[in-house]
Amino acid sequence: MALSSTNIIKVIVVTDDLEKTVSAYKTLLGTGKEPAEQNTGHKEIRAPFMKYKGADITDTPMKVESVFSDNFWFEIIQPLGNNDPWAAWLKEHGTSICSICLLSDGPLEADEEIMKNAGFDSLFKHEKGYEAYEYFDTSKALGVLVEVKEQYK
C-alpha cells in the first residue's frame, strides 16, 4: 500500500556551513517565493513532543534557512548538537541531501502504519501541536530518509 500522498513539499539538506550552502543554492535558484501557507498563524491541537530513536528528547539545536523554488523548497540545516537525525546524517554523509518531505493527506498515524508495514522504522517524530512530522529510516533502500508531515486543519 502506498503513502497517502506523493506531494513532495521540501528537500532537506544538511551541512556543516549553513551560509556557504545557502549562498550556493541561492546563486543557482535565486531567492524564490515563500508559499503563502508557510508562515500563517498556528492553532495548537495536540500536545507537543519529540522522539529520536524511540526516546523522548527536548531539543534539536540547529541553524536553518529555506531556499524556495517554484514547486517546493530546500530546507538547509546546520546541526549544532549531536542527538538528532540531521547531525547523524551529516556525520556519516557530509553536506548532502538528507531527506525528502511528503505532505500527508490524512492522519500521520495512517502513513506511519504503512511505513512500518513496509519495513521502515520511525527514526524521529516531532509533534508541534499544530502539525506533526516523522522521519523514517529509508536510507538503505532509497538513499535518503523520508519525512511525512501532517498539517492539522
Protein language model annotation of sequence segments:
Residues 1-4, 153:
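Basic/polar N-terminal segments that are highly enriched at the extreme N-terminus
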Residues 84-85, 140-146:
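Short, charged/polar, Gly/Pro-enriched secondary-structure boundary elements
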Residues 8-16, 65-75, 89-107:
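Vicinal oxygen chelate
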Residues 12, 75-79, 123, 148-151:
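A structural feature that tracks compact, well-ordered secondary-structure segments
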Residues 51-53, 79-87:
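Short acidic (Asp/Glu) patches
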Residues 3-5, 14-71, 110-140:
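Core segments of cupin and vicinal oxygen chelate
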Residues 85-90, 122:
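A short, polar/proline- and glycine-enriched secondary-structure boundary/capping micro-motif
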Residues 9, 98, 132-134, 144:
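Generic beta-strand structural signal
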